[in-house]
């Protein structure tokens, strides 16, 4: 069964603003930079624009810090807090550029939990069409201990079994009930305890999975 862990911030609930003097980078959906400028006046945005037409690195960081700090306190308190073996996590981003932003911020946020301030090389990776051999990446995410967090758009949304997956995180909203069911369904695959421990050594069993909802995707009809 799925359990929902909801993360709310000021921006996701009430919107925010790009302040006068802030640097703005405009990109295409694929992440190609088309324009960069410094704002001369305040630009307000509402919650519905966040992570759609507006990507806020500060907002992503707050979500990732909340997630990090909840793993071994709220979600998996019975596990030994080994940061190199956090539960396998799949994050859904809105597009390729958003996915890249998330990967970079995950690296920074989780690095704080490692002694030398560096996360393992394969700890978080992007699985999108721009990321190279996606079939190999999906296989490695399924079987390798070092690969803990995958960030994707829709590539891993359907037809992909990652049985050790224990967290599905939504950093984008979904308005299709069929797609939403397929996306959250990535987490519901069962796995025997010995197989789980092969890739997540501090786990004992998979009796549920978590939907980490950063955008309210669990709270509205599709």
Give the role of each language-model region:
Residues 73, 93-126:
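Conserved helicase motor "Helicase C" RecA-like lobe of SF1/SF2 P-loop NTPases
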Residues 63-73, 100-111, 184-194:
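Short, well-ordered amphipathic alpha-helices
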Residues 67-78, 110, 141-154:
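Structural motif corresponding to the C-terminal cap of alpha-helices
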Residues 2, 12-17, 100-101, 179, ...:
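Short helix/loop capping segments that flank catalytic or ligand/cofactor-binding pockets
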């Amino acid at each position: 069964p799925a359990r929902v862990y909801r993360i709310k911030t000021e921006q996701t609930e009430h919107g925010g603003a790009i302040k006068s003097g802030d640097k703005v980078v405009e990109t295409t959906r694929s992440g190609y930079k088309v324009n960069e400028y410094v704002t001369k006046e305040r630009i307000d945005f509402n919650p519905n624009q966040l992570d759609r037409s507006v990507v806020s690195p500060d907002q992503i960081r707050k979500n990732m810090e909340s997630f990090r700090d909840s793993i071994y306190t709220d979600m998996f308190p019975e596990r030994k807090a080994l940061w190199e073996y956090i539960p396998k996590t799949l994050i859904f981003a809105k597009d390729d550029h958003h996915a890249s932003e998330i990967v970079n911020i995950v690296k920074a946020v989780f690095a704080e939990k490692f002694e030398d301030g560096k996360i393992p090389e394969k700890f978080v990776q992007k699985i999108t069409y721009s990321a190279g051999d996606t079939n190999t990446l999906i296989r490695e995410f399924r079987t390798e201990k070092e690969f803990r967090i995958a960030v994707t758009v829709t590539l891993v949304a359907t037809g992909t079994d990652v049985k050790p997956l224990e967290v599905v995180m939504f950093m984008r909203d979904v308005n299709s009930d069929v797609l939403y069911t397929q996306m959250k369904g990535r987490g519901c695959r069962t796995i025997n305890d010995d197989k789980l421990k092969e890739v997540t050594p501090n786990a004992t069993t998979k009796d549920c999975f978590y939907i980490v909802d950063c955008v309210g995707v669990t709270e509205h009809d599709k």
